[in-house]
Amino acid sequence: VLFRSVKKIFTDKDSIRKLDEQGMTLSSANSINWGRLAPQIAYYVSAYCDMLNRGDIQMGDAINVCVPTGNFGNILAAYFAKQMGVPIAKLICASNENNVLTDFFRSGGTYDRNRPFHTTISPSMDILISSNLERLLFLVSGYNDAMVADLMKQLDETGKYSVPADVFETIGNQFEGGFCDDVQ
């Protein structure tokens, strides 16, 4: 019900007009919005510092980070934290039955949304197109926008794509994936 109410506000022309008259704009901070990813980076810096302060690790010790994800946003924030210097060894994507990311990592870089969609007890992970993965592909490909655009075109037209081996090697050295179903 809350989701429908929020969605209604975003599509209600009268509400949007009233906000506009007051010089306001309504925005969302979902996981494809950079405004949501930026503060998530701080979670990983803070968590690392907390482990240091508790004596769980020593400065410079690498940690593994496991993040439940469907849209690849929060785990991408962890990747950014790693790029900024947080010693993270592996970034582990935990998925539900809609395990498109797990299959991407296990297949060596083939992303295939052509599969049954499962409605699960983790609806925020019920996703077959992980839009933030596109950002990672852009970064690890050396900002190759033409390659990424071609992959996204393939995804749109055929429902799948395979990343070049050299790009996946960079990804595969840092990420892995796993999944469980609702029973597990």
Predicted feature locations:
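Short, small-residue-biased leader/transition segments that mark boundaries at the very start
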Residues: V1-L2
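Extended interaction regions within the primary functional domain
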Residues: S5, A29-G35, S107, H118
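Internal, well-ordered alpha-helical segments in soluble enzyme and binding-protein domains
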Residues: S5-V6, L37-Q40, N74, N132
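Structural signal for hydrophobic packing residues in well-ordered secondary-structure cores
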Residues: V6, F10-R17, V45-G55, K82-V86, ...
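Amphipathic, alpha-helical segments enriched in basic
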Residues: I16-L26, G108-Y111, R115
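Active-site-adjacent helical/loop segments in soluble small-molecule enzymes
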Residues: D20-R54, M59-A62, G142-Q184
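A conserved active-site cap/scaffold subdomain adjacent to cofactor or substrate pockets
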Residues: A62-I63, V67-L151
